[in-house]
Amino acid sequence: MLVTGATGYIGGRLVPRLLEAGHDVGVLVRRADRLRDVPWAASVDVIEGDLADRAAVDRAMDGIEVVYYLVHSMGGKDDFESTELTIARNVAASAREHGVGRIVYLGGLHPATGELSQHLRSRTQVGRILLDSGVPTIVLQAGVIIGSGSTSFEMIRHLTEVLPYMPAPRWVRSFIQPIAVRDVLHYLIRAAEVPPEVNRAFDIGGPDVYRYGQLMNGYAVEAGLPQRPIAALPVLTPWLAGQWVNLVTPIPRRLAVPIIESLQFDCVMREHDIDGVIPPPPEGLLPYRTAVRLALERERAGEVETSWRNAEVEGAPSNPLPSDPDWAGHTAVSYTQLTLPTTSRV
């Protein structure tokens, strides 16, 4: 199996689980030194190269049966859309020529009609290129992913913890169907076993649908914080909202803006056909608040397996240094309420 995006949030969690399942795993990374401190690095075949370089992709594809396509340029350069399409075409053509049996791509939930954001449009086009490659492909379309260290979770967390009152853009009213990272990994792993005649996109999501503002208040309950009064301000554009999120959270604007643009739409499943191809986990899909509770437990215990920082834009001044401890860059807010008794004069 070949995993692209192995240094990212999802890829860094998928690789060790594939190894635990007994698979031979290769990873294609631009810089092998980024795997220096990864515990599973010695157990995989590391190919150094850029996905935009067709020759590097061909080297990585040799002898591969399943390709996991987990890369996207959300935090990259301004021309990320062109770069993403070039990479997708390279992977599609190389996989076809090398006789790969299955491509698994993690895309994003999006509305069936209407104008998409640049970020969602690009991810949709990548999925189409892979589906048209001639290689059996499954596109798993997920919305907000909840797990310790995920960009979406950290954005909800910091907005809720930092602001006692939430003057928010209108997307706080959008309906969201979050999914636990544990369940995303379940679908990714099982997708490799799907019969070759299956070649299509599937929506995936958890059991709950909330407005985005309700996600924040659900987090507040699990974190022991008071629920936040939220006032929607329709005047904030996605760009301005991205600046605002960058100001009050550690999420950089280049990551915040694409997420916010996708939140302009309702991010909910339009179909549940995935159940007929990949059944849910035996214990069921995690409810949102359970996923939040588990994520908080991991963060408080310092057991964050991967973080959005793994895939952050290199060189950002806010990045922790290599010499910093694992917990550097995180924040924790506790809420204490003190009630003073009063006595009447005698």
Q: Where in the sequence are the language-model features?
A:
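N-terminal Rossmann NAD(P)H-binding glycine-rich loop of SDR-like oxidoreductase domains
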Residues: M1-A21
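Conserved beta-loop-beta element that borders a ligand/cofactor-binding pocket
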Residues: G107, R128-T151, M155-H158, V162, ...
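Glycine/proline-rich active-site loop of Rossmann-fold NAD(P)-dependent oxidoreductases
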Residues: G147-M155, A191-F202, L225-R228
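Substrate-binding strand-loop-helix patch
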Residues: F175-R182, I204-E222, A232-Q243, E283-P287, ...
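A hydrophobic C-terminal alpha-helical subdomain
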Residues: L236-G329
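Conserved small/polar residues in nucleotide/adenosyl-binding loops
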Residues: Y335-T342
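Substrate-positioning beta->alpha
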Residues: T151-S152, W171-A192, R200, Q214
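NAD(P)H-binding glycine-rich loop region in Rossmannoid oxidoreductase-like domains
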Residues: D33-H98, G108-E115
